[in-house]
Amino acid sequence: MANPNKRIMNKKSKQASISSILNFFFFYIMEYFVAVDNETSLGVFTSIEQCEETMKQYPGLHYVVFKYTCPADAENTDVVYLIPSLTLHTPMFVDHCPNRTKQARHVLKKINLVFEEESIENWKVSVNTVFPHVHNRLSAPKLSIDEANEAVEKFLIQAGRLMSL
């Protein structure tokens, strides 16, 4: 005869599994709609400190886009990386032109070191809100310095409003 305690444990275990799966999908779907609703360019930063300060106000869905210009490549100089704001040292996404794997790996190594270096002259840092589970091709926004500053100001104003709620 089966142990009744074991049956109860199995039932509770199944209920817990189903509950965790439902929770996962609920937050996954919510995250999707929040991200799609807020999919906007938030500006370009000239220093890691400025970027980090802003990112602290918006943890979660926001990704940092590091746009590196390689002087050796005159035709197409951009190699783009997305890194989650909560784990800035872990590269998660690479978007580069075909046949540029070596260049991409070189930049990937540089990203891992960028927080230890004071000089980031060749880097432009911008912030996008994106849906983190969709690994489609994304690129850094093309903004002028004035547009970038305006976008950052708007972003900081919005962040201030949200923080005061």
Swiss-Prot record:
Which signals induce this protein?
Answer: Expressed in the late phase of the viral replicative cycle.
- Report the transmembrane regions from the record: 16-36
- Superkingdom as given in the UniProt entry: Viruses
Q: How does it sit in the membrane?
A: Single-pass membrane protein
Tell me which family the UniProt entry assigns to this protein: Belongs to the asfivirus F165R family.
**Record protein name field:** Uncharacterized protein F165R
What keywords appear on the UniProt entry?
Answer: Host membrane, Late protein, Membrane, Transmembrane, Transmembrane helix
Top-level taxonomy? Viruses, Varidnaviria, Bamfordvirae, Nucleocytoviricota, Pokkesviricetes
Query: Where found in the cell?
Result: Host membrane
Keyword Disulfide bond found: no
GO CC entries: host cell membrane; membrane
Q: Which residues form the signal peptide?
A: none
